[in-house]
Regions:
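Charged, alpha-helix-forming regions
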Residues: 1-201
Length: 201
């Protein structure tokens, strides 16, 4: 049994509860447009792309999850730490509940939000989302000590991915697949434990 499983079993004997985003966070959009971007500006400007651009003014100063309202639905996620500006069609999810670690929520969104959106889609693709869809998304709430332990493990994989990116692309792909596997296992909260590695050290 892994440390995560031991903690969940000991601290959550009745199982892990889930809560919808509307009970945990504030959700809203920005008010900036792409034309407001300033090359070389001091603040990140989150639009609807994989990488933020720059701007010379900021709207928010906090830790939040950013997702696009159009394009890249379920594939683009950012987490902010400090001052930033936000596009009028990008969503800011700012957690106000003391029961959740934003970094944990970020990893959970990255792992589960796309399938949540697709399960409610009327077609094979989703080109845009609205605030009510985000508010209905359910997030598990294991004790903070469990959330922090999961974040620590996934941060390690994230840091390793960044180091490998400049070195070996093939190795990076293997590590990314490993990261995604363990991310999904750690965040599944079902009754089937992840497979244990065989052999001994």
């Amino acid at each position: 049994m892994s440390r995560i499983e031991e903690l969940v079993e000991r601290l959550c004997p009745d199982g892990v509860k889930f809560e919808s985003v509307d009970m945990l966070a504030e959700v809203g959009t920005g008010n900036s447009d792409r034309k407001d971007a300033v090359e070389g500006g001091p603040y990140p400007f989150y639009v609807r792309s994989q990488k933020p651009i720059a701007i010379d003014t900021y709207q928010f100063d906090d830790v939040s999850i950013i997702i696009p309202g159009e394009g890249g639905i379920g594939d683009i996620f950012h987490i902010t730490h400090g001052k930033y500006a936000l596009h009028q069609r990008a969503y800011r999810i700012h957690f106000t509940s003391a029961d959740i670690d934003t970094q944990f929520a970020y990893y959970y969104f990255s792992s589960h939000f796309k399938s949540f959106i697709m399960s409610r889609a009327v077609s094979a693709t989703v080109t845009s989302i609205r605030k009510p869809m985000i508010l209905k998304f359910q997030i598990p709430l294991p004790p903070l000590v469990v959330q922090h332990e999961i974040v620590k493990i996934l941060d390690t994989f994230t840091d390793l991915e960044a180091e490998l990116e400049a070195e070996l692309e093939a190795e990076l792909e293997a590590r990314r697949a490993q990261y995604e596997y363990y991310r999904d296992q750690l965040l599944s909260f079902n009754e089937t434990p992840p497979p244990r590695s065989g052999g001994s050290r």
